Amino acid sequence: MKRLIAAALAAGSLVAGSSAAQVALKPETPNLLFWSAEQQARWYPAMETVYQTRPIAAGDRVHALPLSGRTLDPVFTHAGRTWTVDEYMATYRVSGLLVIRDGRVLLEKYGLGRRPQDRWTSFSVAKSVTAILVGAAIQDGRIKSLQTPVTDILPELRGSAYDGVTLRQLLMMSSGVRWSEDYSDPNSDVAKGPTEGVKLAQGQPGLNPVVAYMRTLPRAHAPGTKFNYNTGETDLVGILLARAVGMGLADYASEKIWKPYGMEMEGAWVTDPGGLERGGCCISMTLRDYGRVGQFVLDEGVIDGHPVLPPGWALEATSKQIENGQAGYGYFWWMQPNGAYQATGIFGQSITTFREDRIIIVVNSAWPKSGGPDLRDGRTALINALRQAAIAPAP
């Protein structure tokens, strides 16, 4: 288990979920972890044609992202060679690259045949959006606080290892409940959980398969003491949130962010076998709408002077709350050694924010594998170069 966690941390994030965690529209759909390059380029922009999804409705207004009047074209070194932005995008299969500073676009580029109106899947970037919505639910009074026991909202978990676990501990990946996220092991929780959950939920109307499986797990550590990346638990937070607000996450995201903040296009959110949006995976949105998510958090969740999030929530969620063997972890947000906070998804999805510089860098990719130091380090070199170019005096 220690080896698994170390490898996953080195990759920057773990796999978003097994193929059985979402419902394919066609039974012959291959495991999304092993799609070919051609399948990635075709299906990442069109997940709603592959899996069951729910729409995130947009409104009439669009949050403006005006051009800054200057462009970025840094040259940087990585892996013993010099790179241009275009060379990086071609080599690392980047479909979208966006740099925003002070709400203005400094760079916007597309690859792999993607167009500005095309969406792209988020993988685990969805976790960070789920955390935003938890904050909105607290602001709305639909969740009392982060100290709310999980079993208060999901009483189906009473008598399980989740007794005494708080919502905050779930958001920190520190419930203490045993979980294995090893995709090479068919007996790991992340591999067998979705299928086993469906079996356990049969004959129990209203019981979500994720809840059915998670409540069978034993406790490994005292709650709040140890970080352990757990995609099943992020889906559990999504179920808890939907229960608290009385609607699906797609509808709540539309109500709290998409419509009032001004996303330019409808989003799509993949659902689990129980028909609920996955708190841990797979929202589809345009490149600029990824940038708007980053800007919304950077602006602390305030829309037209109206706070969508509790005071201080955005800062707290995107600051280190627990040690994780790297720079730290917040509430479904990763801290980075370069001082940024980041929403991260496998196969090269990220929203990186430098708070003090008010810079947001979005990268959407179709990496040939889910992650790894080589891929992560290349992206970090690109991001650092873009940041330096953005803060340099204009010519």
Model-derived features with residue positions:
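N-terminal leader/targeting segments and the immediately adjacent pre-domain N-terminus
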Residues: 5, 17-115, 143, 172, ...
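Active-site Gly/Thr loop motif
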Residues: 208, 264-267, 312-361
